[in-house]
Amino acid sequence: MLRIMSDMNICVGSDGYNFSYDRTITCTDPHPRSFGTFPRFLRLVREHELMPLEDAVYKLTGLPAQILGLTDRGILREGAVSDITVFDPEAIRDCSEFTDSVKKPEGIRYVLVGGNVVLQNGISTGSRTGGVLKKR
């Protein structure tokens, strides 16, 4: 698994669904990766020193956007859509387990979608920006 993760031609993805952390809404036990795929990848990269952090971030952002033909996503440059996750590289980790899958990851400070803050200090702002992405 670690060898495959290290291949720069392979991006990271998940078939997990978008569930709420609110157990009154999420009345099922989703797979733990629905809440932790990307933090888990970053944790494994850090712990096993698989690649530089910027390469790991590219495998989560720029490479999938390129593969999907999303030319205005996945990279920070003028004219691109500002979808940004600010995280502590030493603290980021997945916390979900099969026995308790609805758990927030640690180490994520801010999330911006389309330039709008949707997560601040690990807490949702209630912003509902974003939408379905289509190849252009």
Regions found by a protein language model. Give the residues of each.
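C-terminal cap of metal-dependent C-N hydrolases
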Residues: 2-9, 14-15, 85-129
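Context-gated lysine
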Residues: 33, 59, 103-104, 134-135
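Long, low-complexity intrinsically disordered regions
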Residues: 128-136
